[in-house]
Amino acid sequence: MTSALHQSSIKSLPLLGRGKVRDMYAVGDDKLLIVASDRISAFDVILDDPIPGKGQVLTELTEFWLNKLAHILPNHSTGVRPEDVVAPDELDQVRGRAVVVKRLKPILVEAVARGYLIGSGWKDYQATGAVCGIALPAGLQQASKLPQPIFTPAAKAEFGMHDENVDFAHVVREVGQEMAERIRDVTLRLYTEAAQFAATKGIIIADTKFEFGLDDDGTLYLMDEVLTPDSSRFWPADGYRVGISPPSFDKQFVRDWLETQDWDKTPPAPRLPQEVLQKTAAKYREALDRLVA
């Protein structure tokens, strides 16, 4: 197996912060170096054991989708090679897992598109018959395909907290009517086009979240990670049945194993066995191979 990177240590650039998976460094005043580590989180806890190759999969898939969907919306790409902005002894930390992107002002709304009823959307529907204020037909089951994709935004939570589903009016209050409508329309267009393509590869994209940002002129850009197993639910089409939660190309092995442990879902998490690490790495890799092949 490839060696895993739990945390980058780029000394030649100023560190701006670390998220659950990505480390962010400043490249001058107008660009960022974003390094996708192999960290994995479950139940909002970052685990000590990285998943070998995960950062490369996330980076390659994001680049694939950014190129495929560039006609819909401009994105954060700069064309600058990560290898050209770090010191020679730091090349191994960025190769295949880092990007140099435009420095944008992030819009603090998670732009979620759902084509199927699962996860928090399924819970909302069971309680209210609606998701994020959007009424849905009666009688839908878990994993039902929706009549058409819906825009179900979430308010970005503080680190370690769950994002909270909100209605469209919340987005309007945050960014104004015109920008809210643009974000909704672009989100649904990106999702629909990606889902149609993935279906030809035997993958259902049940839902996904996009991140958007603005430049100094107020132009909207697609940013951060795009249509990866971390930001989306990918289901194998041949394993899909209404009424059950289908298997997915992500950290389900990790979550399932942790559920069998005597753990209260606060740090530190139990150490993961090799089998779980290897199976999870293989699932991420399979998603990439299926989509990009």
UniProtKB/Swiss-Prot annotation:
Its EC number is 6.3.2.6. Pathway: Purine metabolism; IMP biosynthesis via de novo pathway; 5-amino-1-(5-phospho-D-ribosyl)imidazole-4-carboxamide from 5-amino-1-(5-phospho-D-ribosyl)imidazole-4-carboxylate: step 1/2. It catalyses: 5-amino-1-(5-phospho-D-ribosyl)imidazole-4-carboxylate + L-aspartate + ATP = (2S)-2-[5-amino-1-(5-phospho-beta-D-ribosyl)imidazole-4-carboxamido]succinate + ADP + phosphate + 2 H(+). Belongs to the SAICAR synthetase family. It comes from Bordetella petrii (strain ATCC BAA-461 / DSM 12804 / CCUG 43448). GO terms for biological process: 'de novo' IMP biosynthetic process. Pfam families: SAICAR_synt. Keywords: ATP-binding, Ligase, Nucleotide-binding, Purine biosynthesis. It is an enzyme of class 6 (ligase). The keyword ATP-binding applies. CDD domains: SAICAR_synt_Sc. The keyword Signal does not apply. This is Phosphoribosylaminoimidazole-succinocarboxamide synthase. The lineage of its organism: Bacteria, Pseudomonadati, Pseudomonadota, Betaproteobacteria, Burkholderiales. PANTHER family: PHOSPHORIBOSYLAMINOIMIDAZOLE-SUCCINOCARBOXAMIDE SYNTHASE. GO terms for cellular component: cytoplasm.
